[in-house]
Amino acid sequence: MAIDEDKQKAISLAIKQIDKVFGKGALVRLGDKQVEKIDAISTGSLGLDLALGIGGVPKGRIIEIYGPESSGKTTLSLHIIAECQKNGGVCAFIDAEHALDVHYAKRLGVDTENLLVSQPDTGEQALEILETITRSGGIDLVVVDSVAALTPKAEIDGDMGDQHVGLQARLMSHALRKITGVLHKMNTTLIFINQIRMKIGMMGYGSPETTTGGNALKFYASVRIDIRRIAALKQNEQHIGNRAKAKVVKNKVAPPFREAEFDIMFGEGISKEGEIIDYGVKLDIVDKSGAWLSYQDKKLGQGRENAKALLKEDKALADEITLKIKESIGSNEEIMPLPDEPLEEME
């Protein structure tokens, strides 16, 4: 539909004035601006990358990863840091919980020598550091662990029995208002790790669970990932890891509510090889005959753990099967459901 010529002139004049005051590009016609593809940082999990729809977590956005204790929240975040560093990214870890295991991070592939780490005393200090490094323009990814540990200064300075209603929620709301635009401008990804709490006096319908830090983060986050431990992995009666399910409960860059399941092995993190086998079997790329798993004419091993061990050693073969899986799923990146039952017994 054609726009009136007088209106066009008025709009053009207004755009010029806005450009003078706020800088070029402050207001643009969408048709004049090329729509850029959303860049992403891999999560280190094939299934979760597919579930997110763009191959990982989006750059320049706020991400929330939440779930119960020992569900894999920090492990997933450390994998994202490792993937970002592999592509030359600079990463920071704001350890508000003062609980970062450097040796574990290194085993997950994190370049700990070049990882920026802060262990702030208060929530205000943590968020000031976050804002400063983001505004520098030199950082690609920041992880805050965790929202629950961002304790307001007034609460730290007060007595144990003092009531500080809504202080943390106001702190988060204020910080997110300030930093959202900066993150987009600097193309910096911000990941908040969060814990869950039970709603007091919850009656009737709805989930009794909620996340800490108020409602602001729920609104500002472009992606929210709920991660849960769903089973224990055992080998010869020995507990060797956990099976985790990650659900994308909010996604502003692709369809939400997709899920992914993966193994988190103790001391190793997310098992990429396990996902390759799961998706390979589901898509008939990997053959399963009894307990034996094979790819084309090559035997991968008897049992899932043996096949995983072979793929861990043969990176070229693992990459080849991964490529076949991605091609099979297709360019629309529709997530394929995982097997209804694990390939080996779990508890």
Curated annotation (Swiss-Prot):
Keywords attached to this entry: ATP-binding, Cytoplasm, DNA damage, DNA recombination, DNA repair, DNA-binding, Nucleotide-binding, SOS response
Chief subcellular location: cytoplasm
Protein name, as recorded: Protein RecA
UniProt xrefs under InterPro entries: AAA+_ATPase, DNA_recomb/repair_RecA, DNA_recomb/repair_RecA_CS, P-loop_NTPase, RecA-like_C, RecA-like_N, RecA_ATP-bd, RecA_C_sf
Cellular component GO terms held in the UniProt record: cytosol
Localization per record: Cytoplasm
The keyword ATP-binding is assigned to this record: yes
Gene giving rise to this polypeptide: recA
Sites where the protein binds ATP: 67-74
Organism for this UniProt entry: Helicobacter pylori (strain HPAG1)
